[in-house]
Regions:
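Aromatic-rich peripheral "rim/lid" segments of glycoside hydrolase catalytic domains that contact
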Residues: 21, 25-142
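Extracellular glycoside hydrolase catalytic/binding regions
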Residues: 1-16
Length: 142
């Protein structure tokens, strides 16, 4: 999942730039956007119970699907959990995506651990396996 790869890379960079780890040492944390898909993002007040697939803006930072002159960003799909179809009471259940499971592992890492070095931080990140997160996420779709 592109989302999982980007989030893993973002959090690794955040932790590498924590005070005392030799890089910029100017980072005290970060924020993951967003918890669940935002089905209201396309149309704002229409199709609120539908997961639209329309990209509404373009960002060249995502090379996997960027084509110059075409939109590739759809915020309805930004959640680390996906929404299931609307329930009869107009609420949603959610399914954790691979990014959710990767973030669980990322947030077990303490960048301020005693004797933390850039090397052992990288070692901890290398233990996080995208394939395992993808498999867990697939189980939620059954």
């Amino acid at each position: 999942s592109s989302q999982a790869k980007y989030l893993l890379s973002n959090w690794k960079e955040i932790y590498q730039n924590a005070p005392g780890l030799g890089k910029a040492e100017n980072c005290i944390g970060g924020f993951t956007f967003q918890w669940s898909d935002g089905w209201w993002k396309t149309g704002q007040t229409t199709n609120l119970d539908k997961h639209d697939s329309t990209a509404s803006w373009s960002n060249g930072g995502y090379r996997y699907d960027f084509v110059k002159g075409q939109n590739n960003m759809n915020e309805e799909w930004f959640g680390v959990t996906s929404k299931r179809p609307t329930n009869t009471d107009r609420t949603y259940s959610v399914n954790p995506r691979a990014a959710f499971y990767l973030l669980q592992e990322v947030h077990k890492i303490n960048p301020y651990k005693k004797n933390r070095t850039p090397e052992n931080l990288n070692d901890e990140f290398s233990k996080i396996k995208l394939n395992e997160a993808l498999e867990k996420a697939k189980l939620n779709l059954r």
